Structures are given as C-alpha cells and as structure tokens.
Regions:
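Regulatory extensions flanking the kinase catalytic core
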Residues: 240-258
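ATP-binding glycine-rich loop module of kinase domains
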Residues: 5-60
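Conserved structural core of kinase catalytic domains
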Residues: 66-105
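Conserved N-lobe motifs of Hanks-type protein kinase catalytic domains
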Residues: 61-65
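C-lobe/activation-segment region of protein kinase-like
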Residues: 144-146, 151-241, 245
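Catalytic-loop of the protein kinase fold
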Residues: 119-140
Length: 258
C-alpha cells in the first residue's frame, strides 16, 4: 500500500489505519470507537458498493450479534463496529509467539458456534460470503467472533468478486451455500490446529487433492474433527445442522468421536 496514492476519508490519514485488504482501507474513528471502511483506490468502489448493499440487507433483516454492526455510510465508504481484538488469524499468530495466550478447546467451540450462527443468518438473507477465512472473522472486546468483509460476496446470486484461499476453496461451485460450508470447515480446522489445512503445499496441489476428495486428517480433533470432515465432504446442506452438531458436543469438543 503506497500511502500517498490511497484515498483516505476526510479528516483521517495513515496514522489512523488499522487494516487494509485488496479493495478496502479501514481507519479507526477514535471519537466514536467505530471504523470507516473506504475504497483503497478508485477502481475498488464496486466492491465497497456491494458490501454496503449487503450490510443494508442484513440490517433490514434485523442484523445479527455475530456480524459487525453496520452504522451507515461515510462518503464513499461504510461505518462499522470496531473489533478491538482484531481478526482471529492475528490471535492464532500471537499464540505461536506467546504460549500464555493459547486459546482453549472451549474457546474454539464457542467461536465455531458463533460463526455458524452468523452464516445461517447471512444465507437466510440471500448472501453467500465467498471469502470466509480467519482473516475475515473479528473479535470484539470480549473475544466473541464477528463475521465481516462482504466486499467480494454475492447478493441474490450476483457473481462473487473475489476468490477464497485455495485451502478454503470448495472443489465445486463456489457460489453456493456448500462453498461457504466448505470454507467454514477450513476455518474451524485453522482455529483448532493453528494452521490452515495443507499449509505446506502449493495452491495447485491443494486444489488437486480436494478434487480427489483428499482432505487433511482430523482424527486427533475428536468431535470437532467430525464436523470439519462433514463440511469438507458436502454432508451438510445448511448451517442449521452444523449448529445442532456443535451444540451436541457439550463442553468437550475434542473428546473422541463415538
């Protein structure tokens, strides 16, 4: 990101940036403890417009506590709830460096359930996320998961504007509920193991293995591993069944599957 080429919201600059992606720049508005997401460059406005329409749809449907709250538009961007603990991937990276920050199986189960509940609501509103990774799931002040980043998502069957990482990509139609379910399986795998599936392999090799139905081993992950495999193998038709399976795990999601 070249600072002097970026479009900042009025009154904000490089010092206020908390995150950026391929299409959007996120700055912190300290006065309201919200963030403003704007197009990174002029040619990114289509993606941000898509995201705005999706947030408006989700808000019209009542919103959901596991999705970043939408606070309307700002210039060509949108104002969203601020998640002070960053994204889940940042937390996973931090625990590698500092063992005292290691997350627990109970925390993993909570995140999995919160993300699944968010996705069930998202799909009910005619939205396919299409880019579900730990980078797009944020943590609020109480470390509750919040799904976000709809700039590449589909609304009412429109084309996806982004491709998800190979480790999370469904070996079938990606513009589908099953595409998000497959990615969810990879998200939970990363949360429970600390690394994306097949992290050591090239994108081409990952794609080839997925097409052959060869997925990362989850035997050591107990009941959570069973859910992950069912996501990858297309054994769920929607998130409602996933939510039921996650709730049935009780307090011991890593206990051996029966």
């Amino acid at each position: 990101m070249v600072a002097d080429e970026v479009k900042y919201p009025a009154g904000f600059g490089f010092k206020d940036v908390v995150s950026h992606g391929i299409s959007g720049l996120v700055v912190l508005d300290k006065s309201s403890q919200t963030v403003i997401k704007t197009p990174l460059f002029d040619d990114c406005e289509v993606a941000l417009s898509r995201e705005r329409h999706i947030y408006e749809r989700l808000t019209q449907r009542g919103g959901h506590e596991r999705i970043l709250r939408y606070h309307g538009t700002v210039e060509s961007g949108i104002r969203l709830e601020y998640a002070p603990n960053g994204d889940i991937r940042r937390t996973l990276c931090a625990q590698e460096k500092e063992p005292s920050m290691k997350t627990t199986p109970k925390q993993h189960q909570q995140w999995a359930l919160q993300i699944a509940e968010a996705l069930a609501f998202i799909h009910s509103a005619g939205v396919v996320h299409g880019d579900l990774t730990c980078h797009n799931i944020f943590l609020d002040e109480n470390f509750n998961a919040k799904v976000a980043d709809f700039a590449g998502s589909s609304l009412d069957g429109t084309d996806l504007l982004v491709c998800v990482a190979a480790s999370h990509e469904y070996p079938g139609p990606t513009l589908s509920v099953k595409g998000d379910i497959f990615a969810f399986g990879s998200v939970i795998y990363e949360i429970t193991t600390g690394a994306a599936p097949y992290k050591e392999l090239s994108d081409d090799e990952i794609e080839a293995r997925y097409k052959r139905g060869e997925f990362a081993d989850t035997a050591s992950l107990g009941q959570m591993g069973v859910v992950i495999q069912k996501c990858w193998r297309g054994q769920y038709d929607g998130f409602e069944a996933i939510i039921q399976d996650l709730k049935a795990q009780g307090e011991n999601p890593i206990m051996p599957a029966t």
